[in-house]
């Protein structure tokens, strides 16, 4: 709710009006049935937003994976933004961030047992996933597909950044909205993301009123929780110290940090690290940035200028996917590179309610699942 954070380019309003008219007509064609949305025979959950930029879609998708994977055969379908491939690609052990995109690759490496694919055409992608015989897909999670209306999801989850609520924003290019605020009405769940842990009750009430949701829509608030630093190159790290696998943030006291990010909003990570050390240099690139040879050289030079006896390079999990296969990253740097994991926490003691909302939808719309089979066996 930091309104100073929101930058509106008013001189671009005329272009935004034209863009808005085109998007509105497109949405109306779907609403009126002139353009058809396709439903599928399995639960399809869409996670998306109204704006461009980071609202935390990947961490929230990972939350759903962890919630569902033990009882259902889950598949994740993403567009694979900025990948160096086209069409439908099923993730394999040989996949890289270049072949499927950095965020899909991140999820694939963290959850290798979960089926993951990328396809610009989400209908085609779902059809391909459902044609897989083993395992037979029971739930599809659509990553960043809120505007892809050719698919009709059974449950739509809309994310909005606490610091840039969609009700405070305006359409591209003057603002960052992909479509008008009315698009929120397609969501059954709205989550205000990136909330401070100590958010006040009055802020909950203010945001609830400002979002102006319908009775059929459930509102939740979430926050980021940062885990222990993970070595990006564990084998390189073990050559120096075989006992070091991960580092708690509390161990960063008296450590010099070079923070390297290529994400939409690195400020929250920087603020988190400042809680443990004030010796931080930051090197920021655009979101989904593919690191060039010059970038790697710049990282090496900036890291070399850190004066402390103990020093590390800290990056995000997403950026780590683009560094891990980089051909010119030197062996001497690898042991010092750590990724900072992010997990989602549902606030207001609403986590159980949120989990049951998701599980209830999947259970009611799943034709066959290990969970349902065990439940039926227990009842008999």
From Swiss-Prot:
List the Gene Ontology MF annotations in alphabetical order: ATP binding; tetraacyldisaccharide 4'-kinase activity
Q: Which organism is it from?
A: Bacteroides thetaiotaomicron (strain ATCC 29148 / DSM 2079 / JCM 5827 / CCUG 10774 / NCTC 10582 / VPI-5482 / E50)
Q: Which GO terms describe its cellular component?
A: plasma membrane
HAMAP family reported for this sequence: LpxK
Q: In which pathway does it act?
A: Glycolipid biosynthesis; lipid IV(A) biosynthesis; lipid IV(A) from (3R)-3-hydroxytetradecanoyl-[acyl-carrier-protein] and UDP-N-acetyl-alpha-D-glucosamine: step 6/6
Q: Which superkingdom, per the lineage?
A: Bacteria
- Reactions it catalyzes: a lipid A disaccharide + ATP = a lipid IVA + ADP + H(+)
**What is the protein name given in its UniProt record?**
Tetraacyldisaccharide 4'-kinase
Q: What does this protein do?
A: Transfers the gamma-phosphate of ATP to the 4'-position of a tetraacyldisaccharide 1-phosphate intermediate (termed DS-1-P) to form tetraacyldisaccharide 1,4'-bis-phosphate (lipid IVA).
List the InterPro entries: LpxK (IPR003758), P-loop_NTPase (IPR027417)
* Family statement: Belongs to the LpxK family.
Q: Which UniProt keywords apply?
A: ATP-binding, Kinase, Lipid A biosynthesis, Lipid biosynthesis, Lipid metabolism, Nucleotide-binding, Transferase
Q: Which PANTHER family match?
A: TETRAACYLDISACCHARIDE 4'-KINASE, TETRAACYLDISACCHARIDE 4'-KINASE, MITOCHONDRIAL-RELATED
Binding residues for ATP, per the UniProt record?
51-58
This entry's Enzyme Commission designation comes to: 2.7.1.130
A biological process from GO: lipid A biosynthetic process
